[in-house]
């Protein structure tokens, strides 16, 4: 600081240098130093000074000190005005608000020093604090916010600028740091101000929340963006209001009415290209005439905002016409449209309620697309009519799309040049200005071009455009029709006249024409006034001398809400007004009605009305005479006519079909097909379906005594008994234990309706009991009354047993010829194959085939059957339990039929009680001794030691497995097993039950060597038996076992390895029963099909893995899966018994005694109690259409739980397989009838059906196989990121599906195999992509199995190849369209839908305004109906930042943790196209006020949380069209029940499937 100046004059005046601090008054005056301002003495002194300060001296100096207004703060600089003493605002040592603001802002990155500016106003001082932050994108333009307390209770009125600075700083501190308790550090004064601001914040409204943001710059950017949006919405609302439209602004209807929820505001908009919409409408009209039943089906559509009173269907002709008209017009419909809908509805109701009504009344139902509306509520029916028949541009705003899906540049103009481009723009002008259909205008221009070429004439561009309008007018009036007018009125006449205008019209006439047209325009201006005659802008003109005559319009002299103008056009070669005798065509003025507010069809209707006054039934002679004379003056007449009628026509518009009938073809115009009340009523779904009709009208031929047949059968029996080969076979049969019990068995059957036979393995019950019954009947002369059906649980069992019985009776079934010898008594029938003669009396079949015969097979009471023998009844699968239930009911209806139940391990008491204490008989077995070898025995005897390579990297650990291993060791030690063997058994047991193929191969090799040694030593008979039977759980395991055996067994030429499972053909299955060549040993590797019924006669050794695949329900996926688990002890006993049929045998069990005793259940749990019941429900409904399924299944041997039945009902209704109107009595839908024929999980079956009909069968076979197999990708914990990237590499652009990515991986593997890549290359590829080779093989096997099901039901042609490249046009036309594939996946998985919640948009400020910040993938949230869920990191969609749709469908869910910490993860997700939801989702619910469509549960009265779970913004017309397409799809499926392959040939079916496919390909957008 500079030294203070010493000059006395300066000192006395108080003047100092600019660098020196000013002198206080008490120094200059030489008085005592005043006390500090915050002391009591200072305050008393201020009071006294204020009271005495009243006089002012003449020199301008005060007579006494002025009151203290401001002073320096504690440690603060600055002062008051001149002559005022400085004041301390805060106690010494206080931290001032200003300093606190500087310090805290300085710590914030990028923030600049605050600018604190005091501002003076009338009441004192206020303060504004400006904050700035560095803008990294534009350093010269930092982000800026300003804080100034303007709230009434917080406004500053400080006495000094310094005080204002501190209080302003306090305000700024609170705005930024209100979440902190800074008031504790503030001095008195600002501290109380802080508390005051806290109180204000608590009571502040929610819209002021932005004020308390810790980052004011971000809050300001967001607020600016919201303000800009509101301004745009306000302008949009004003624009809509000016056009008389209704729009939704700020979540309200025109800024008023009820507010919309956040879900509706954020819903995605569905867009439908107008070209696609027209195609859909044309397809619906054509297809409804082919499928009239679809028109009568209930419309799967309701209105969400519909009142309860109006929701009920009205079947009477009584309609509140006035009230309904008022309601419809309140929605914005024109009064004429509303009246038309009410008139139609009234006629439709009369026609339906009175079948004898006149044909005129019945004509109300001329369009079958609307027949169903007659059974809807009044408003709903009227709205459907209006949605379908009101031109889209004339719909109220809430009912039509807000945006267009068409491209601005059409294909006709893209890349065009020269004349083509000029024609394109001319077409646009005529379409937009006159409202003419684009296709019709294009057709006229083609006619003009053809005429030019033919006559070698080239017209000027303006002439061609004017001529096109003149030709369109004549065509629209109908004068081109021979029955409508003379030749001179046609468009061809005017075309010819204009082409030859230069040669046929002389110069004088040309000049006269020009003069008359000019005079006429002057007359119009003189009569109407210059303000009503307007020249349109250049780009709107249709000719060179166009002018508009205003008829009505807001803001004009004539006024009116609608814009109506008559445009008069001319061109250089126009004929008007030329007399008729001077031209070959009638010379009319070229005119049209133009408007900014009217829809195109109303503009055309007004124009058409004026045209018809020249010619036809409505001809006005004065107009006609004026045209004939060529005097002109017709324009004023047109204006007068238009003025008198335009408002009436707009209020009550004509039908669109009458306006467009001459402009468009019949496919585009509204065509109709007449329907009568009788045809409509007959087609209603309340009538019996074809299946029900078959049940009632069908019926097998009842058994009758036929002496001729009896005699023939006895002759055959004698011939059999006298044949040379019979004696040996008879000897074999008599040696079976069943033969000694034959008399007792037959006696029980004769005297009882139901008999239970428990026969030990090998007793011969399966082959002999049916023959006992047949032989007795034939011998008694009653063979004609004997017809036996024997059911087997598997196809291979039915074939094997039938073949054996045929041999015993001297017949042959195992040949390659499909036909059997006439008169053969033994045959078999399996799904897709039947080998039996017409005289067959002993038919072996699968359980499912007999169930279908009971259902839709035409013999519901089995009147043509005398005995039903159910074999292996102990297995308790769903089909066998269902068959028992059906047979128990059948016994009441059919008094003659007999039922025999057989099994080796049957629980006699359970079955006897179920069938009313039916008698039981037991037959002892005839088997040789079988020696058991458990795992510990095998290891000890063979010396096998596991290498450890098989389980490396996959051995399971943990407390549970270690505890089990400890118990196993104790069990082994109790048997006296040595330590080395214990360790080997423990090592093999650590796999958790997984099969060791190294062990399996070694055991088979050991058995082969052991058998050879025994046979060489004579310990075993080498001529009898010696075959080895290996039991594996599934087809994939069979393949691996064969590989292991092939590798292990020495001298492979000495063994023949054969697989055996249900997927093999009948010929392949027969090979296992045939003997092998001398010196060779047969090894059969089989699933549990060889466990019962089938007897491979030469088996002496059984190798049992102890594993089986059971159908179980997985809660996390909700899918039926085949789960590998331990077999039951009863099943293993059956397997063991296979070894002792022909000689002493041995059973090698690849599991320990500990597993046998502790892990295996005694009996298998009935399948009906452990699997989902959807398939069973479908089967029951296909057989008993109106049955209460719950009540019926409660009669089963072991009824399923109520919870599982409720779940099945819900799932079937949601899947669209079951109607929802009658609960457990509801009928099957068309889709449900197809699903009932597929013995698959509901979702897989639906996926395959939909994939077939929509041309993507190949990919869906793969996807369905992936769903039913173990995961395709192996994900090691330590390489999760690499595995996820590998899976994502298969997700092609537009795929957006985990399942399709997996399918792409499988297809690449198939391609590598087709290219004959080496096993090493394929293995390396799999390892590099973390793909399981066993899963790939399983998927391939499953594809073949699934395809066979579709081919057996006739849905897919037999020549379709499962190994193709998706090039079959019938079934794979859409295989490359990701939109169709994702839609079909949604169809199969609905209602497993998850909502995507993208975070609210955030904005950054820039020099050009605010810019939206890109969202991060981790900010995207997902919600199902129960709350928030999470996408699994392995999903290919996990890193997606944005989605085209707002919904995903997921195949599986998994949960981690428990309680509040648990998270639900989604797996196998697929993004869902919006139209897929509309076409394949739940019930559609139109919300007119929200301008959207909700998609909820298919169930009536479903859970509230399921209602409108999916919300889409779309106009009601889209909802109605989608509902109509749904009904047509049902009709196509219904048609395909009898002729499934006709879907692709019948035009109606093909058109419906094609148009739906086109919609799904681009999600409603034009191609």
UniProtKB/Swiss-Prot annotation:
**Keyword Transferase on entry:** no
Disordered as annotated region, ranges: 1-95, 670-734
User: Which keywords does UniProt give here?
Assistant: ATP-binding, Helicase, Hydrolase, Nucleotide-binding
Indicate, by first and last residue, each region the UniProt record lists as having compositional bias (Low complexity): 39-48, 55-73
**UniProt feature, compositional bias: Polar residues:** 10-20, 670-687, 713-726
User: Where does the record place Gly residues bias?
Assistant: 74-83
Tree of life domain = Eukaryota
SUPFAM superfamilies xref list: P-loop containing nucleoside triphosphate hydrolases
**Record keyword Cell cycle present:** no
Enzyme Commission number(s) of this protein: 3.6.4.-
Paired cysteines (S-S): none
The record places domain Helicase C-terminal at 1003-1184
Q: Which residues bind ATP?
A: 759-766
Return the InterPro entries for the record.
DEAD-box_helicase_OB_fold, DEAD/DEAH_box_helicase_dom, DNA/RNA_helicase_DEAH_CS, DSRM_DHX29, Helicase-assoc_dom, Helicase_ATP-bd, Helicase_C-like, P-loop_NTPase
- What PANTHER family does this protein's entry cite? ATP-DEPENDENT RNA HELICASE, ATP-DEPENDENT RNA HELICASE YLR419W-RELATED
> Know the name of this protein?
Putative DEAH-box ATP-dependent helicase UM11114
Source organism per entry reads Mycosarcoma maydis
